[in-house]
């Protein structure tokens, strides 16, 4: 399922996104965020994070740098004790 979601995002990036002006207020773009979130967390949690990110994309949100959160195992591995 995750690969199917990534395929849908890639389809959007390649064929639909070029038809409209660049409007993403975030870095990375919402579509790149979605791909990274799905790869890192899987289809369900990654899809949920992507949906939350897209819902933040409106004129009243300042935007800016909004990276995909680290997975808990990655955070534990890099934690300094």
UniProtKB/Swiss-Prot annotation:
Could be involved in insertion of integral membrane proteins into the membrane. It comes from Geobacillus kaustophilus (strain HTA426). PANTHER family: MEMBRANE PROTEIN INSERTION EFFICIENCY FACTOR-RELATED. It is found in: Cell membrane. The lineage of its organism: Bacteria, Bacillati, Bacillota, Bacilli, Bacillales. InterPro entries: Membr_insert_effic_factor_YidD. It is a peripheral membrane protein. The keyword Iron-sulfur does not apply. Belongs to the UPF0161 family. SMART domains: Haemolytic (SM01234). The keyword Ribonucleoprotein does not apply. This is Putative membrane protein insertion efficiency factor. One of its GO terms (cellular component) is plasma membrane. Keywords: Cell membrane, Membrane.
